[in-house]
C-alpha cells in the first residue's frame, strides 16, 4: 500500500475535500509544488489555478482554486482557498466567455493596471478550462 497523508481543502463556503491522498500538485507563489508524504513543513501562498489530488489507490480529482494558503505539517496538509470549485461543477461556456472577454480587454488595455487585471482574469479563465479538460479525461 502506498504511503499517504491527510488532506483538507476548504474554502469560505464549504469543505471541498477531506481524506487520505498519495500526493497533490498545486501552484505556489514560487512555482509548481508536488507534496508527497514526508514533505518538509511549509506555509506558502497559492496562485490561482488547480490542485491535482491523487487519492489513495491512484484515483485523481481536480479542483480550481482562485488563490489561498497551503500549510504542510507532518502527516497532514491543509489548503485554505479563497474560492474552490470542483472540476465537474465548472461551467465550460462561462469559462470560454471569460477567456474571450479577458483577451479583448488585453488588446484594448490603456495602462499597466488594465493590462495586469486583464492578464489575471485570462489566467483564471485558462486555469478553469484546464481543470474542466482534466476532469473530463479522468472520468
Curated annotation (Swiss-Prot):
Coiled-coil ranges per UniProt: none
Membrane topology term: Peripheral membrane protein
Database matches in SUPFAM superfamilies: Epsilon subunit of F1F0-ATP synthase C-terminal domain, Epsilon subunit of F1F0-ATP synthase N-terminal domain
InterPro entries per record: ATP_F1_dsu/esu_C_sf, ATP_synth_F1_dsu/esu, ATP_synth_F1_dsu/esu_N, ATP_synth_F1_esu_C, ATPsynth_dsu/esu_N
Chief location: membrane
GO MF term set: ATP binding; proton-transporting ATP synthase activity, rotational mechanism
Keyword RNA-binding: no
HAMAP family in the cross-refs: ATP_synth_epsil_bac
Function field: Produces ATP from ADP in the presence of a proton gradient across the membrane.
Assembly and interaction partners: F-type ATPases have 2 components, CF(1) - the catalytic core - and CF(0) - the membrane proton channel. CF(1) has five subunits: alpha(3), beta(3), gamma(1), delta(1), epsilon(1). CF(0) has three main subunits: a, b and c.
Name of this chain's protein: ATP synthase epsilon chain
Annotated source species: Citrobacter koseri (strain ATCC BAA-895 / CDC 4225-83 / SGSC4696)
Gene name in the database record: atpC
